[in-house]
């Protein structure tokens, strides 16, 4: 069973007027991981699709997604899959990949229907593509690692880059996840924006009672969303995107847009945040 929700894009002036319920309706993506289902959110931010697949012992096939206007989802798209659960298998284009927890798979345009099997909890990211690059499974030890932050600022972390120009080719998808060092809870702080790319976050590895306070909005008009385990949020190009957890967590970041330059950002000075 595949469920698809559509999210239209919103400008910053309209977003300023929203209350908590309105912000969550526009940007928060919960309930992506439902047993025995594929659940997708088709966003109008660079046409990024965000979703989850939980086979729970019965294979799930992702094929036609009506909002894409194509017979199969990968006819004119590429896909990244991150396994945030137990071991599972993903099959497409006549190949199969065994995915452990934390593995990331890239599937190119034209790979055909995608089958998810096993006990995995598969986080799905897809964006339009113009050509087919080779499919590739990337494990944590093969990702590019960037260490940032410090214990003194509670933001010491390792950024693991998987679908990234220095690791492999893609059309516009850039995907990785960030792991925190002991005692650090702040992500993407100091904050930044990147007007040429949207971004989506998935927060996971949270304890049941833990929460992440995700900050968004224009630097001069910040808002927050309270996030639980395995919940996602879409970040428009005009918005900051950072957060602070009540305990340890990991988050997947994914971008699509005009370029694949992870460093192409506009930093926001602390004194400019409101």
Swiss-Prot record:
Cross-referenced InterPro entries: KduI, KduI/IolB_isomerase, KduI_N, RmlC-like_jellyroll, RmlC_Cupin_sf
CDD domains to which the protein is assigned, alphabetical: cupin_KduI_C, cupin_KduI_N
Cofactor note: Binds 1 zinc ion per subunit.
Required cofactor(s): Zn(2+)
Keyword tags: Isomerase, Metal-binding, Zinc
Pathway membership: Glycan metabolism; pectin degradation; 2-dehydro-3-deoxy-D-gluconate from pectin: step 4/5
Catalysis performed (reactions): 5-dehydro-4-deoxy-D-glucuronate = 3-deoxy-D-glycero-2,5-hexodiulosonate
Entry's EC annotation: 5.3.1.17
Residues annotated for Zn(2+) binding in this entry: 192, 194, 199, 241
Pfam families: KduI
Functional description taken from the UniProt entry: Catalyzes the isomerization of 5-dehydro-4-deoxy-D-glucuronate to 3-deoxy-D-glycero-2,5-hexodiulosonate.
PANTHER family noted in UniProt: 4-DEOXY-L-THREO-5-HEXOSULOSE-URONATE KETOL-ISOMERASE
Family, similarity comment: Belongs to the KduI family.
Protein name: 4-deoxy-L-threo-5-hexosulose-uronate ketol-isomerase
Species this chain originates from: Cereibacter sphaeroides (strain ATCC 17023 / DSM 158 / JCM 6121 / CCUG 31486 / LMG 2827 / NBRC 12203 / NCIMB 8253 / ATH 2.4.1.) (Rhodobacter sphaeroides)
Gene that encodes it: kduI
